[in-house]
Amino acid sequence: MSCLMVERCGEILFENPDQNAKCVCMLGDIRLRGQTGVRAERRGSYPFIDFRLLNSTTYSGEIGTKKKVKRLLSFQRYFHASRLLRGIIPQAPLHLLDEDYLGQARHMLSKVGMWDFDIFLFDRLTNGNSLVTLLCHLFNTHGLIHHFKLDMVTLHRFLVMVQEDYHSQNPYHNAVHAADVTQAMHCYLKEPKLASFLTPLDIMLGLLAAAAHDVDHPGVNQPFLIKTNHHLANLYQNMSVLENHHWRSTIGMLRESRLLAHLPKEMTQDIEQQLGSLILATDINRQNEFLTRLKAHLHNKDLRLEDAQDRHFMLQIALKCADICNPCRIWEMSKQWSERVCEEFYRQGELEQKFELEISPLCNQQKDSIPSIQIGFMSYIVEPLFREWAHFTGNSTLSENMLGHLAHNKAQWKSLLPRQHRSRGSSGSGPDHDHAGQGTESEEQEGDSP
């Protein structure tokens, strides 16, 4: 069947009138819709542009042969097996709130600005739809639906797309993590030092970036993608590979859903670029870059939040804090996140062992204990950033609360260290594994949270 490439939005328009279909080929988002009854299929890692790149690029004297592509796609099949079935297996209808839990979920939403908000309980009460339910509520609470004249049905459709593009089989990088980061971002946007300067656009950007910052995460870090010569690593030339993919996936879904199609073109382009800047800031490999800039601004007292660029920088910092705030939650929730992220690390280690690859730092369950990983992550990544955030907020109640939880949780993990490690502290998770212990999206292995 012949097809005509169209530049705008990466669309493919089929010339055959009987197959009047539109295929949106943005990276991270492919769907086929038409009158032929073909069921929509979302395949985050199979964009058309990726195949072109693989088939036309030479690496280490190797041409993109069919054999090489087949080897690369074998890793994709491993990661996305369940996702490839989404277009085949009918899905149960999505219910925002199960009737049995409606009252409890609504009660929780009334306290969504509290730092002890239990996202795990909320996810259960919403029948696994915590991200969609939370974002719909926050968009309404912040007046974004009215201000930007958003269609509620279209907003819901977009949020469902985002939620479904997270991999539920990932212990850590899943839609619940996205909801947790979004709830944290909501709390940070309410900080008095920041809130009085924020525009509706700032708030919408912050919430959207938080919700989609890890979309279509494969459950492995950037070094893994590089050493397996994954097509995404080739596409982004080993630079912020996962973050770039999250951003492009988000833009693809925004365009497909047409959530912002009624806004001026210049405005939507600006939104897309700012979303990219925010999501790319979560690359743990850029931690020192942002921390140094923040320290300099605070030392020089030259932050002018009336200025859009300075506000955007603080939104980047807020998102970075939200992304790695797990150690600053109450122990019961922080511990769950720590166990989840380490389980994801260990799974990567098992995969590397299976394919006879060198096991990445923090991914060897026999050598890297959860306490040592978490202590290193807190010491090298979390504490430095949150101390500066507290400085920015003027040691607000929330900042003091977070630092208190952080100190308590670190002490808890130290008490759980294997005896032979206690005298010399943690075995060292440095800013190595992405997030040093978490992550890096670029390492991302959690950069995300410990």
Swiss-Prot record:
Keyword annotations for this protein, in alphabetical order, are:
cAMP, Hydrolase, Metal-binding, Phosphoprotein
Cofactor details (free text): Binds 2 divalent metal cations per subunit. Site 1 may preferentially bind zinc ions, while site 2 has a preference for magnesium and/or manganese ions.
Binding positions for a divalent metal cation 1?
H177, H213, D214, D323
Q: What is its EC number?
A: 3.1.4.53
Per its record, how is this protein called by name?
3',5'-cyclic-AMP phosphodiesterase 7B
The major lineage groups are: Eukaryota, Metazoa, Chordata, Craniata, Vertebrata
Keyword Transmembrane appears in the UniProt entry = no
Q: Which residues bind a divalent metal cation 2?
A: D214
- What is the species listed in this Swiss-Prot or TrEMBL entry? Homo sapiens (Human)
Tissue expression, as annotated, is: Highly expressed in brain. Also expressed in heart, liver, skeletal muscle and pancreas.
In which pathway does this enzyme or protein participate? Purine metabolism; 3',5'-cyclic AMP degradation; AMP from 3',5'-cyclic AMP: step 1/1
Q: Where is this region: Disordered?
A: 418-450
Which GO BP terms sit in this record?
A: cAMP catabolic process; cAMP-mediated signaling; chemical synaptic transmission; signal transduction
